[in-house]
Amino acid sequence: MLSDSDRVRVLSEALPYLQAFAGRTFVVKYGGAAMKEEQLKDSVIRDIVFLSYVGIRPVVVHGGGPEINTWLAKLNIEPQFKNGLRVTDAATMDVVEMVLVGRVNKEIVTLINQAGGQAVGLCGKDGNLIRARAKGEESIGFVGEVQGVDTRVITALVEKGYIPVISSVAADDTGQAYNINADTVAGEIAAALGAEKLILLTDTAGILRDYRDPSTLIYRLDIAEARQLIKDGVVSGGMIPKVTCCVRSLAQGVKAAHIIDGRVPHALLLEIFTDSGIGSMLVGSNAAYDSAFSG
């Protein structure tokens, strides 16, 4: 339990960050264990509402893999994956859209509203927010990628104090629905908005030099270092698309991207408002970030 003096120290440490980030947009990708465990779910929701109350503009993008699998099982549809991507035939696409847009999205909206925020649920189809196209592999079905982002509906909402909650289902020019990786959607939305931060909640501590040893966490790195870690095989497996997504968003103008452990209660606040943080922060260049923050 924190003493009164500890609480004051924490608040004092947070002050420069509160001042620096007021009025800025943060895109938070919400997924993994933080969506499944009630206590973690509650802490994430409270953190998002806190950001809104202190003048930051949070935009939430969510996945929902476990919930999709639950409903596929109920409907006797066997989940299939290829190279880490869900194989999405027509029947599976119907379930994905029903679950992500109709259930998971509305649950998050309800929880934010109950916690004192004002959330509005969206999917990529709303306001032509995300234009999708096929990923180009017929064998994975209706798995898409982002062709373009129209941020007007998001901007209109955040300027009125609402918290957009976005599911990663979008349509192509013919109206065909596609399932798009939620990390990718979050990165592209962050870039299109010119967001201050992209934050990915994951089930790992961040980027580790040795994936078996949490003490090897890399707290900060720039684009060049991130690309080198991928080349050297230090970043591998499921972390590659996450790091690549962060690098792509930084290259398009996002100020910083964070990969943090969503299994830690209040991970968002710990990463944003403490000097040490708890995860990995990626920046375009270390020198430019230091100059911008100190200035």
UniProtKB/Swiss-Prot annotation:
Site (described: Transition state stabilizer): 29, 242
Binding-site residues for substrate, renumbered to this chain: 64-65, 86, 179
Family as reported in the entry's similarity comment: Belongs to the acetylglutamate kinase family. ArgB subfamily.
Main localization (coarse): cytoplasm
GO CC, any one term: cytoplasm
CDD domains recorded: AAK_NAGK-C (cd04250)
Organism domain of life: Bacteria
GO-annotated molecular function: acetylglutamate kinase activity; ATP binding
UniProt-listed NCBIfam families: argB
Cross-referenced SUPFAM superfamilies: Carbamate kinase-like (SSF53633)
EC id: 2.7.2.8
Gene Ontology biological-process entries: arginine biosynthetic process via ornithine; L-arginine biosynthetic process
Parts forming coiled coils: none
Transferase among keywords: yes
Catalyses which reaction(s): N-acetyl-L-glutamate + ATP = N-acetyl-L-glutamyl 5-phosphate + ADP
One Pfam family in the UniProt entry: AA_kinase
Function: Catalyzes the ATP-dependent phosphorylation of N-acetyl-L-glutamate.
Protein name: Acetylglutamate kinase
Pathway entry: Amino-acid biosynthesis; L-arginine biosynthesis; N(2)-acetyl-L-ornithine from L-glutamate: step 2/4
Enzyme class: transferase
Alphabetical UniProt keywords: Amino-acid biosynthesis, Arginine biosynthesis, ATP-binding, Cytoplasm, Kinase, Nucleotide-binding, Transferase
Protein localization: Cytoplasm
Organism annotation: Thermosynechococcus vestitus (strain NIES-2133 / IAM M-273 / BP-1)
Xref: InterPro entries: AceGlu_kinase-like_sf, AcgluKinase_fam, ArgB, Asp/Glu/Uridylate_kinase, Glu/AcGlu_kinase, NAGK-C
